[in-house]
């Protein structure tokens, strides 16, 4: 868990705001469920979910939850270092690095995550389920698989100097 929201600007993206219903003996009881992504645009990003009787309270809860869930993703030259595939339930997300000037080529929820993360050039394809919550969670599973040069060198038991020649 990274506490970056205290000192940096935040990019907040609302993925979904749903009115949900609970049927009780006296009728229907309505509440709101909010799903958000928060990032600093410099490699830190997190998602959050919140439910409340009022939409603004649900958004506040999801924002608090997202700030608690921040994680670091290594970014190199405005894109990810290598291709990754993330899966969560039946949602599958393919993320490929792109050259400078390509832009963010991604569908709704993945685009919001990439913009909050600070990625400027990326190719992405969402496969399987299009449930926005599962797609975002699959994107975060893909982020867990992203390796930077230091991690690769450590896994191979080499230094960065010998790895790059």
Curated annotation (Swiss-Prot):
NCBIfam families: rpsE_bact
Domain S5 DRBM: start-end pairs: 10-73
Domain commentary: The N-terminal domain interacts with the head of the 30S subunit; the C-terminal domain interacts with the body and contacts protein S4. The interaction surface between S4 and S5 is involved in control of translational fidelity.
Subunit and interaction comment: Part of the 30S ribosomal subunit. Contacts proteins S4 and S8.
Function: With S4 and S12 plays an important role in translational accuracy. Located at the back of the 30S subunit body where it stabilizes the conformation of the head with respect to the body.
Domain of life assignment: Bacteria
Disulfide bonds: none
Annotated Pfam families: Ribosomal_S5, Ribosomal_S5_C
Family of the protein in this entry: Belongs to the universal ribosomal protein uS5 family.
Alphabetical list of Gene3D superfamilies matching this protein: 3.30.160.20, 3.30.230.10
One term of GO molecular function: structural constituent of ribosome
Stated name of the protein: Small ribosomal subunit protein uS5
Encoding gene, per UniProt annotation: rpsE
GO CC terms: small ribosomal subunit
One of the GO biological process terms: translation
Keywords, comma-separated and alphabetical: Ribonucleoprotein, Ribosomal protein, RNA-binding, rRNA-binding
InterPro entries: Ribosomal_Su5_D2-typ_SF, Ribosomal_uS5, Ribosomal_uS5_bac-type, Ribosomal_uS5_C, Ribosomal_uS5_N, Ribosomal_uS5_N_CS, Ribsml_uS5_D2-typ_fold_subgr
């Amino acid at each position: 868990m990274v506490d970056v929201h205290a000192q940096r600007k935040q990019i907040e993206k609302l993925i979904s705001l749903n009115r949900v219903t609970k049927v009780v003996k006296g009728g229907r009881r309505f509440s709101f469920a909010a799903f958000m992504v928060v990032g600093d645009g410099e490699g830190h990003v997190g998602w959050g979910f919140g439910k409340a009787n009022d939409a603004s309270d649900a958004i506040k809860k999801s924002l608090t939850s997202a700030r608690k869930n921040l994680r670091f993703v290594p970014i190199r030259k405005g894109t990810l270092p290598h291709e990754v595939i993330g899966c969560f339930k039946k949602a599958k997300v393919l993320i490929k690095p792109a050259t400078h000037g390509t832009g963010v080529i991604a569908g709704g929820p993945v685009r919001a995550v990439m913009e909050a993360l600070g990625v400027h050039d990326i190719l992405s394809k969402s496969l399987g389920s299009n449930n926005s919550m599962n797609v975002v969670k699959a994107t975060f599973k893909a982020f867990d698989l992203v390796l930077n040069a230091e991690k690769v060198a450590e896994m191979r038991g080499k230094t960065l100097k010998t790895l790059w020649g």
